[in-house]
């Protein structure tokens, strides 16, 4: 996992600093904050405007994808809190200074993350492989993928 956001645009770095501050002040027991997706991979789109053959204009802009790993009994509740409290606070703080795409924040527990990494769950495995670590309180170690027996792989596939 990468650890520097220096290659990102200055404005994006400022947005990430505000998001990190809001996450840390509004969620408890945060272990890690990871930027993933197009910004982490360096394939983000600042602004794209296209016109189709009928003259219809479409606009596209990459959003900020954030994974928060925290000790919580209810990751879904923490994620809802992020959507309902952190994102609106972010919108208010960054009004007129940010791009229109709201940040996408997902929240997971350390147990869920390590179970997914152990199983090489594509979504989380890619986040860990390509992501940028924004915050680490030093109390959580991300596990390593394991070579699983066929029986276990089949069981996981059936569960999902």
Residue ranges of each PLM-predicted region?
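Cell-envelope/extracellular polymer assembly enzymes that use nucleotide-activated donors
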Residues: 65
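Catalytic core of pol beta-like nucleotidyltransferases
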Residues: 1-61, 70-160
